[in-house]
Swiss-Prot record:
Protein name: Queuine tRNA-ribosyltransferase
A single MF term (Gene Ontology): metal ion binding
GO biological process: queuosine biosynthetic process; tRNA wobble guanine modification; tRNA-guanine transglycosylation
Classification via InterPro entries: ArchSynthase1/Queuine_TRR, TGT, TGT-like_sf, tRNA_ribo_trans-like
Its job: Catalyzes the base-exchange of a guanine (G) residue with the queuine precursor 7-aminomethyl-7-deazaguanine (PreQ1) at position 34 (anticodon wobble position) in tRNAs with GU(N) anticodons (tRNA-Asp, -Asn, -His and -Tyr). Catalysis occurs through a double-displacement mechanism. The nucleophile active site attacks the C1' of nucleotide 34 to detach the guanine base from the RNA, forming a covalent enzyme-RNA intermediate. The proton acceptor active site deprotonates the incoming PreQ1, allowing a nucleophilic attack on the C1' of the ribose to form the product.
Binding site residues for substrate: 89-93, 143, 187, 214
Key words, A-Z: Glycosyltransferase, Metal-binding, Queuosine biosynthesis, Transferase, tRNA processing, Zinc
GO cellular component: cytosol
Cofactor note: Binds 1 zinc ion per subunit.
Segments for region (RNA binding): 245-251, 269-273
Top enzyme class: transferase
Length: 370
C-alpha cells in the first residue's frame, strides 16, 4: 500500500491511496457491502456511482456463505465480481452489537450464531485468518468497540484489551504473510487521555493506516465532534485516516475539515431503501404525497442514472407500490450523491477553497428541498 498526500488546506487533506486492486482518491466514501453486496446494487451500477472502494463484513461473510465458498473463488473480489479495492472490518463491531449473546474474554469473544445458534469463538488471530482468505486490500485489527455510555475505568479497560488484541492481530497478520494493508483502530470512548494512550500504543506497533473507532454509537453529536477534533490531528500524518461508521453528509464535511481521509456508513443505502433521499438542497422523503404528481427529477444538479431518467412522481409510485426497482433507483441516487460530495471536497481542497465550499454546502443544505 502507498499513500500520497497531494494537497492540503488547513487540516483537510487531498490524497491518493494505491492498493492491490487499484487507486483511491481521498477523501473517499466507501459504500457498505455487508454480505458481499451493496444492497440493491449490481457491481456495475455501484462502479457507475463513482465508488472507488467498498466495504465487506468479516463477521457476516464468515458465518454465511463461509470461508470455503469464498476461498473456492480465490477471494472476495472474484466472489462478488468487484475488481476495485475492498476494505473488510474485523468483526469487532458486529460482536459488540450482539449484546447479551456474546461473552468477551482475554482470548476473544464467544457468541451464539445469529443464524443458527451455533456456539462460535472469534479471536484476533481468527479474524486475521478470515480477512486473509477474503484477500481484502485493507484489513482491520480485531478490537472491542467501547460501548456508550462508559465510565473512564470501563473505557480504559476496554481500550487496553483492544491494544492487546491489536498486537495479536499484527503478529498473526505478519505470520500469515498477508501482502495487503492492516489498519489500527483508536479506541478510548469519550476520553481524550485514553484516545491519546490508544494512539501512542498503536503507533508503536505500526500499521498502514489508522482509524477512529467507537464513534457514532449513540453518543451526543457534540461528544463525537470533540473526540474527532482531538484525535484526528494526532493521527500519523503520512498514513491514511479513517473515521468508521460516519455518517451524514454534514458529518463527512466536518470530518474532512478535521483531516479525515476515509469514511463508511450504511446511511445512504439504508435511507434509500426507506425512501429518504439526499439532495444538494436538503433531504426528500419520497413517500410523502407531495411528490405524487411531481414531474421533476430528485435533484436537477445530480448526474446519476435515476435523476437523468425518472421523476419524483415515478419514484414515489415505486416506493408506495413496494417495487424493488424503487430501492435500486433510490440507492443509485444516494450513493452518487455521496460520491459527488467527496469529489467536490477533493476539488475544493486542491483549489484551496474548502472553507467557502463548506459554507456553501451548509447554506444549500439548509435551504430545504422542495
Amino acid at each position: 500500500m502507498q499513500f500520497e498526500l497531494l494537497a492540503q488546506h488547513g487540516a483537510a487533506r487531498r490524497g491518493r491511496l494505491t492498493l492491490a486492486h487499484g487507486t483511491v482518491d481521498t477523501p473517499a466514501f466507501m459504500p457498505v457491502g455487508t454480505y458481499g453486496t451493496v444492497k440493491a446494487m449490481t457491481p456495475a451500477a455501484l462502479a457507475d456511482t463513482g465508488a472507488q472502494i467498498c466495504l465487506g463484513n468479516t463477521f457476516h461473510l464468515w458465518l454465511r456463505p463461509g470461508l470455503d465458498v469464498v476461498a473456492a473463488h480465490g477471494g472476495l473480489h472474484r466472489f462478488m465480481n468487484w475488481d476495485r479495492p475492498i476494505l473488510t472490518d474485523s468483526g469487532g463491531f458486529q460482536v459488540f452489537s450482539l449484546g447479551a449473546l456474546r461473552k468477551i474474554s482475554e482470548e476473544g469473544v464467544k457468541f451464539a450464531s445469529p443464524i443458527d445458534g451455533a456456539k462460535l469463538f472469534l479471536t484476533p488471530e481468527e479474524s486475521m485468518r478470515i480477512q486473509t482468505v477474503l484477500n481484502s486490500d485493507i484489513a482491520m485489527i480485531f478490537d472491542e468497540c467501547t460501548p456508550h455510555p462508559a465510565t473512564h475505568d470501563e473505557a480504559a479497560k476496554s481500550m487496553q484489551l483492544s491494544l492487546r488484541w491489536a498486537r495479536r492481530s499484527r503478529d498473526e497478520f505478519d505470520r500469515l504473510a498477508n501482502p495487503n494493508a492492516l489498519f489500527g483502530i483508536v479506541q478510548g470512548g469519550m476520553f481524550e487521555d485514553l484516545r491519546d494512550e490508544s494512539l501512542a500504543a498503536l503507533d508503536a506497533i505500526g500499521f498502514s493506516g489508522y482509524a477512529i473507532g467507537g464513534l457514532s454509537v449513540g453518543e451526543p453529536k457534540e461528544d463525537m465532534a470533540r473526540i474527532l477534533a482531538h484525535t484526528a490531528p494526532r493521527l500519523p500524518a503520512g498514513r491514511p485516516r479513517y473515521l468508521m461508521g460516519v455518517g451524514t453528509p454534514e458529518d463527512i464535511v466536518a470530518g474532512v475539515a478535521a483531516g479525515i481521509d476515509m469514511f463508511d456508513c450504511v446511511m445512504p443505502t439504508r435511507n434509500a431503501r426507506n425512501g429518504w433521499l439526499f439532495t444538494r438542497y436538503g433531504d426528500i422523503k419520497i413517500k410523502n404525497a407531495t411528490h405524487k404528481q411531481d414531474t421533476r427529477p430528485l435533484d436537477p444538479s445530480c448526474d446519476c442514472y435515476t435523476c437523468r431518467n425518472f421523476s419524483r412522481a415515478y419514484l414515489h409510485h415505486l416506493h408506495r407500490a413496494g417495487e424493488i426497482l424503487g430501492s435500486m433507483l433510490n440507492t443509485i441516487h444516494n450513493l452518487r450523491y455521496y460520491q459527488t460530495l467527496t469529489a467536490e471536497l477533493r476539488a475544493a481542497i486542491a483549489a484551496g477553497d474548502l472553507d467557502s465550499h463548506a459554507a456553501r454546502f451548509r447554506a444549500d443544505r439548509s435551504t430545504g428541498a422542495c
